[in-house]
Regions:
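RNA pseudouridine synthases
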Residues: 1-161
Length: 161
């Protein structure tokens, strides 16, 4: 889940990445010394000022998905390293006429909104293609349902079945 609405349906990102070496353990784009890093992105759908994005990394660099999205102007919700906005996602920010106590409001999502929903690979001994799926964690599923309810669209409903 990212901030913003991409103007693209698919995006191919080929930017070399290098560990920054700072205390925060960030990764940066470095065209001279970075290692090849490729990610393909697909817009699943948008709800308000948020979008669900599918990422298919072709290489396996540290923070690759996060950096490639941020470099293209789409930071992951609640990302403390690559977003200028790491604050928790709250229902009061989504609903126009929300009536509640902001001091006692619990966040919908207070961690990095990144989830490995599905991974496929070839079994090293049998050669069989294996696909493993992990349902969305409770906080991400609650966020998905709230976004769908408020904006009357659930762009990932068909994706999870």
């Amino acid at each position: 889940l990212v901030h913003g609405k991409p103007m693209w349906d698919t995006l191919h990102v080929d930017l070399p990445l290098l560990p920054d070496g700072d205390m925060r353990h960030r990764t940066v784009v470095n065209k001279r010394f970075g290692k090849p890093s490729v990610t393909d992105f697909r817009l699943i759908g948008s709800c308000g000022g948020y979008s669900w994005i599918e990422a298919k990394p072709k290489t396996g660099r540290t923070h690759q998905i996060r950096v490639h999205l941020a470099e293209n102007g789409f930071s992951i919700v609640c990302d403390p390293l690559y977003s200028g906005n790491q604050k928790p996602l709250r229902l009061s920010e989504l609903k126009r006429n929300w009536h509640g106590d902001e001091d006692s409001e619990k966040p919908l999502l207070s961690r990095l909104a990144l989830h490995a929903y599905k991974i496929s690979f070839t079994h090293p001994k049998t050669g069989e293609c294996l696909t493993l799926c992990a349902p969305y964690p409770k906080d991400m599923e609650a966020t998905r349902k709230q976004l769908a309810k408020i904006f009357k669209v659930d762009p990932i409903e068909d994706e999870t079945e």
